[in-house]
């Protein structure tokens, strides 16, 4: 893989467009919200937000991007069920 914000191929991490500290765990496991980022972009540049925004709109389109942002504003209403977590566990074999 490669970093979605700078193209680096080493020290990749799960970069969250909407940071985990800003939301419930819902966004931690949202597959649109999580993309490969290198340590520099994810941590040192605090997500490299401008480049990440351009990536998100380019890959998923403005409608999906806007939906994700809107969900973040109402995240207190979104609480994943245990079955959602179990489905992800099975999918990723963790």
Locations of regions flagged by a protein language model:
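Histidine-centered nuclease catalytic patch
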Residues: 4-34
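Short Cys/His-centered divalent metal-binding micro-motifs
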Residues: 11, 33-60
């Amino acid at each position: 893989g490669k970093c979605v914000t700078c193209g680096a191929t080493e020290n990749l991490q799960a970069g969250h467009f909407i940071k985990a500290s800003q939301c419930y765990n819902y966004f931690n496991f949202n597959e649109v919200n999580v993309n490969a980022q290198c340590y520099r972009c994810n941590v040192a540049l605090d997500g490299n937000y401008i480049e990440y925004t351009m990536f998100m709109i380019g890959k998923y389109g403005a409608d999906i991007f806007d939906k994700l942002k809107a969900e973040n504003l109402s995240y207190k209403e979104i609480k994943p069920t245990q079955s959602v977590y179990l489905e992800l566990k099975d999918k990723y074999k963790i």
